[in-house]
């Protein structure tokens, strides 16, 4: 195979605990055996944060060493990282990776990032710390359900799709309204913006989806138990010891961290942490699968079958071979 990258990139998406990391590393190894280097671009809004390793199931040092990874450990937990920043970073990284003669692999489960990369996004107002501080103070007085009701008055379309307790997204929607005077729902994705750039090759978007939800639920429970055994609570305690992090930050709202933080705050018992963490992770997986099924161009692979990884490898290599043949004429 030519050392020049024969296609822009492949993507491996899927809900949490579906086997994305293992599949991506197996594909990278197979490509290397065929003479084609590959580099992984993480599509995960939690992996960007430093010091949040156990609760995000961050790739191990051995896995990170097996293949170059990007967009991991690029932000302090105090900082935000937007979908717009992800799109800009990924487009830049993909170009740099191709220039090195390597093949970019987009791997992760943050579906908003995938959709933003696929459709493009309108230029929304930047975060305004002063506005956020006022909104946080108001929420502390009246609660997020009441803030949700306020959002419904100025942006009913966005309020209708958000749960009253979804503080992070309610805050962002109200922030956009206060900064721009326009509802968040007026900032639409621009379908096809990136189509001509061909960032993901036709046929190259692979989705690991379970046929049996019980299989995924069992893996989620096993993963959460493994996190607890690996010292997840100690990791959260270290974050709390900094003194500058709190529940209103996107980093601490990540699934698992939020539940642990609330338990340590005394809002819930520590005995209920496992049950609440697993339930929240199941809900995340359900939302991820719903997003995936709205993406018609995906190549879905049943991740709960014994040969799921082999199916993905065969399909991915077929896309690479077809692209190589087309390039070589």
From Swiss-Prot:
**Superkingdom to which the source organism belongs:** Bacteria
Gene that this polypeptide is encoded by: miaA
Q: Where is this region: Interaction with substrate tRNA?
A: 44-47, 168-172, 253-258, 286-293
Matches recorded under PANTHER family: TRNA DIMETHYLALLYLTRANSFERASE
Q: Which residues bind ATP?
A: 14-21
What are the recorded Gene Ontology BP terms? Answer: tRNA modification
Q: What is this protein called?
A: tRNA dimethylallyltransferase
Q: How does it assemble?
A: Monomer.
């Amino acid at each position: 195979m030519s050392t020049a990258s024969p296609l822009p990139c492949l993507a491996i998406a899927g809900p949490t605990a579906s086997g994305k990391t293992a599949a991506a590393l197996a594909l990278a190894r197979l490509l290397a055996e065929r003479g084609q280097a590959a580099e992984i671009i993480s599509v995960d809004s939690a992996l960007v944060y430093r010091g949040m390793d156990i609760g995000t199931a961050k790739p191990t040092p051995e896995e990170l060493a097996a293949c170059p990874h990007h967009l991991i450990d690029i932000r302090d937990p105090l900082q935000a990282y937007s979908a717009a920043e992800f799109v800009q970073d990924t487009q830049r990284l993909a170009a740099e990776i191709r220039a090195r003669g390597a093949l970019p692999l987009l791997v992760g489960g943050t579906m908003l990032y995938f959709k933003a990369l696929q459709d493009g996004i309108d230029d929304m107002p930047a975060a305004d710390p002063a506005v956020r501080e006022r909104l946080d103070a108001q929420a502390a007085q009246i609660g997020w359900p009441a803030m949700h009701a306020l959002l419904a008055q100025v942006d009913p379309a966005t309020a209708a799709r958000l749960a009253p307790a979804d503080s992070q997204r309610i805050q962002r929607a109200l922030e956009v309204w206060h900064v721009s005077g326009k509802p968040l729902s007026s900032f639409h994705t621009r379908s096809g913006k990136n189509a001509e750039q061909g960032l993901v090759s036709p046929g190259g978007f692979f989705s690991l989806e379970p046929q049996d939800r019980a299989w995924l639920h069992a893996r989620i429970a096993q993963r959460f138990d493994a996190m607890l055994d690996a010292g997840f609570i100690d990791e959260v305690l270290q974050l709390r010891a900094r003194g500058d992090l709190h529940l209103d930050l996107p980093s601490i709202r990540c699934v698992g961290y939020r539940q642990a933080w609330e338990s340590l705050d005394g809002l819930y018992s520590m005995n209920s942490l496992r049950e609440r963490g697993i339930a929240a992770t199941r809900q995340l997986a359900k939302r991820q699968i719903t997003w995936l099924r709205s993406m018609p161009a995906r190549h879905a692979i049943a991740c709960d079958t014994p040969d799921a990884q082999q199916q993905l490898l065969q399909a991915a290599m077929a896309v690479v071979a077809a692209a190589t043949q087309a390039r070589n004429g």
